[in-house]
Amino acid sequence: MATKKPENLSFEQALEELTTIVSEMEQGDLSLEQSLKQFERGIALAGASSSKLQQAEQKVAILMGKDEKSVLTDFDNDME
């Protein structure tokens, strides 16, 4: 099976693959060459995921801008 380019994966697919790569690298069983290859793939996946998140944020900002009363605020994970 051919590996898809990171930009052609959905956000969820990229995140799942990135999680797998991190897990494999943390185990420490990969050779140096394999580790570098996985690291390179991980960087590409992280970049593509970041780009997809930025696009989603822009879409939300545009949608929120259509309603002048709406205020876009930062997410606070500590709120209960």
Curated annotation (Swiss-Prot):
Keywords: Cytoplasm, Exonuclease, Hydrolase, Nuclease. It catalyses: Exonucleolytic cleavage in either 5'- to 3'- or 3'- to 5'-direction to yield nucleoside 5'-phosphates. Its EC number is 3.1.11.6. Pfam families: Exonuc_VII_S. Belongs to the XseB family. NCBIfam families: PRK00977.1-4, xseB. It comes from the Bacteria. This is Exodeoxyribonuclease 7 small subunit. It is found in: Cytoplasm. GO terms for cellular component: cytosol; exodeoxyribonuclease VII complex. Its main location: cytoplasm. One of its GO terms (biological process) is DNA catabolic process. Heterooligomer composed of large and small subunits. GO terms for molecular function: exodeoxyribonuclease VII activity. Bidirectionally degrades single-stranded DNA into large acid-insoluble oligonucleotides, which are then degraded further into small acid-soluble oligonucleotides.
